[in-house]
């Protein structure tokens, strides 16, 4: 199947793409910035400009079996101004209308149109249990979401199956609400809004991408579909579960009046109560991987397969320039990560050997950008790229120190933030036709004792998160 996706470089899209690729789908992504998307979405995807040539857009739609429309500017955590509301509408309603119009002009239009929506369509219903037949609300968010859905439903007139995906709060450590909440909770101070009695309908990111594929393959599913886990919780309960996995010491309520001063009308995203159940998914037989919140959070914050320690061995393939760093006395650290995937080693090696796939399995908050990379890659190849954490940009140059096709390769930093960085990638065949991917990184920070303090307080923690995300995307791509 060929899938056409909008919003591909967003939080959900960056998980959906590797998952659909693992099922054999080919993908075209319509994006606002092709250069940026190329650094985020990997080498195995076709990119077009969503606001470029209408002929190119229509040609892409003509060859597509399915459209997944995920486009939409971020609503939560921003102040709603007149300008922002215009952006919300244009990126949702107007873009959907434009897609629908182009599809109606196709000679061989897609058979299925899945369009993102939100449980915000129901309005503030407090403790009322909601399913897909519940009435919609009357506030701005409900009306916006209703217009968004109605734009998609125009395709029903053309015998195209339409599903609108009423998403709850999507959970993944490196995106969405958990990315925003985690720093404070991990520093020991959690919070919830108001008295915490508002219901939160949530869903784990893995279940989102699985449910999208399920809707694609199940012809009986049509119309609105609640993308929420079966067990919604209150905001206070959510904070309590998050405290348990992050070891936060204190949870304090934040008066909603304070947030209203910050976000204006946008506070309703945080204070409205939605106790929405996935009735249509459950009745059709969909099985959730994460049906309770504790299970979902424990999975997201688990780092058991990534370990960092002081290096107690000499560096592999030590060069003259770096041999003086060998051994534990030199404050060299070793990161070790292992993942087993259902894929052959040759294909796996090719995937990781392409520099253009790096951005796909790098967290979005690193703002990864390739500056220079020439293929084919081999021993001695040089790559230049840039990462940006907050306001701090860091240029990085590596060269391939060792290259053994389909087995291993090692890259070494020649310019960048580390005094030493050597990353060995091992791709190993297993007897059961799976593949083990091993990452072994030796690294050292500059600035002596200050570097060691920075490592203990921050760097070790960030590296574990980065490689943990890498493994999660790997498991989606090669499930």
Show which residues each predicted segment covers:
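N-terminal Rossmann NAD(P)H-binding glycine-rich loop of SDR-like oxidoreductase domains
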Residues: 3-23
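NAD(P)H-binding glycine-rich loop region in Rossmannoid oxidoreductase-like domains
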Residues: 35, 39-95
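Conserved Rossmann-fold NAD(P)-dependent oxidoreductase catalytic core, especially the SDR/UDP-sugar
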Residues: 85-87, 97-139
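Catalytic helix-loop patch of NAD(P)-dependent Rossmann-fold dehydrogenases
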Residues: 90, 126-164
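NAD(P)-dependent short-chain dehydrogenase/reductase
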Residues: 146, 155-164, 168-199
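Alpha-helical substrate-binding/gating segment
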Residues: 182-190, 198-232
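Mid/C-terminal beta-alpha module of Rossmann-like enzyme folds, strongest
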Residues: 218-265, 298, 304-315
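Hydrophobic ligand-binding cavity/cleft-lining segments
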Residues: 305-374, 378
């Amino acid at each position: 199947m060929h899938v056409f996706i909008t919003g591909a470089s967003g939080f959900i899209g960056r998980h959906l793409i590797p998952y659909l690729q693992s099922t054999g789908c080919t993908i075209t992504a319509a994006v606002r910035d092709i250069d940026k998307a190329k650094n985020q979405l990997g080498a195995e995807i076709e990119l077009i400009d969503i606001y470029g040539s209408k002929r190119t857009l229509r040609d892409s739609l003509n060859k597509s079996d399915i459209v997944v429309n995920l486009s939409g500017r971020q609503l939560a955590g921003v102040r709603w101004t007149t300008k922002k509301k215009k952006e919300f509408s244009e990126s949702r309603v107007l873009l959907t209308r434009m897609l629908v119009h182009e599809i109606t002009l196709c000679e061989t239009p897609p058979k299925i149109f899945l369009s993102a929506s939100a449980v915000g369509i129901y309005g503030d219903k407090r403790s009322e249990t909601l399913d897909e037949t519940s009435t919609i609300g009357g506030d701005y968010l409900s009306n916006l979401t209703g217009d968004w859905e109605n734009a998609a439903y125009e395709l029903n007139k053309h015998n195209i199956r339409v599903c609108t995906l009423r998403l709850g709060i999507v959970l993944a450590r490196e995106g969405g609400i958990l990315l925003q909440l985690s720093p404070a909770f991990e520093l020991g101070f959690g919070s919830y809004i108001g008295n915490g009695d508002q219901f939160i309908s949530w869903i784990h990111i893995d279940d989102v991408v699985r449910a999208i594929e399920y809707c694609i393959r199940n012809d009986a599913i049509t119309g609105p579909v609640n993308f929420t886990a079966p067990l919604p919780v209150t905001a206070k309960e959510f904070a309590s579960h998050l405290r348990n996995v992050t070891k936060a010491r204190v949870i304090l309520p934040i008066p909603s009046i304070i947030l209203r001063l910050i976000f204006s009308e946008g506070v309703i995203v945080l204070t409205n109560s939605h106790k929405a159940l996935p009735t249509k998914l459950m009745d059709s037989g969909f099985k959730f991987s994460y049906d309770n919140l504790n299970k979902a959070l424990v999975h997201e914050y688990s780092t058991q397969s990534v370990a960092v320690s002081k290096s107690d061995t000499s560096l592999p393939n030590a060069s003259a320039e770096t041999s003086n760093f060998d051994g534990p006395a030199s404050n060299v650290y070793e990161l070790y990560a292992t993942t087993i995937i259902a894929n052959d080693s040759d294909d796996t090696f090719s995937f990781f050997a392409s520099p253009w796939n790096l951005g796909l399995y790098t967290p979005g908050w690193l703002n990864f950008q390739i500056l220079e990379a020439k293929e084919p890659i081999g021993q001695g190849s040089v790559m230049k790229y840039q990462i940006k954490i907050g306001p701090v940009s860091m240029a990085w140059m590596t060269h391939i120190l060792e290259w053994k096709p389909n087995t291993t390769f090692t890259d070494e930093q020649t310019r960048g933030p580390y005094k030493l960085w050597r990353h060995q990638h091992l791709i190993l065949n297993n007897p059961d036709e799976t593949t083990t991917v091993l990452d072994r990184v030796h690294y050292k920070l500059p600035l002596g004792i200050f570097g060691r303090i920075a490592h203990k307080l921050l760097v070790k923690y960030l590296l574990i998160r980065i490689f943990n995300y890498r493994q999660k995307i790997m498991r989606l791509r090669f499930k």
